């Protein structure tokens, strides 16, 4: 069964100007939030990087062996970031306004990033605490 990595292999060479953003792109961007970006984007209002730039910085700090030892969700997200960085479709998307807020006192967490596509479209990816357990 195909997954999002297969989709990137299949459609990663097609720009957003040729095929507009779709539901699978949304799924891919939603997964990207699980990459820890704070060391590379410390100021939410001023920091921004392309996916390709973030991948280069992230991979300089995390060896393949280290990535392989990460929990499944984070390992998959790191591998996704690497694949996106090598695709025409995603490499130049700009990541902005990254927030990573954890409160042990309130037992909450929230992270979000705005992804700017080359055509000026914005996508907001976020994750947070679910108190409905």
Tell where the protein language model's regions lie, with residue ranges.
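Non-catalytic, mobile gating and regulatory segments of ester bond hydrolases
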Residues: 1-133
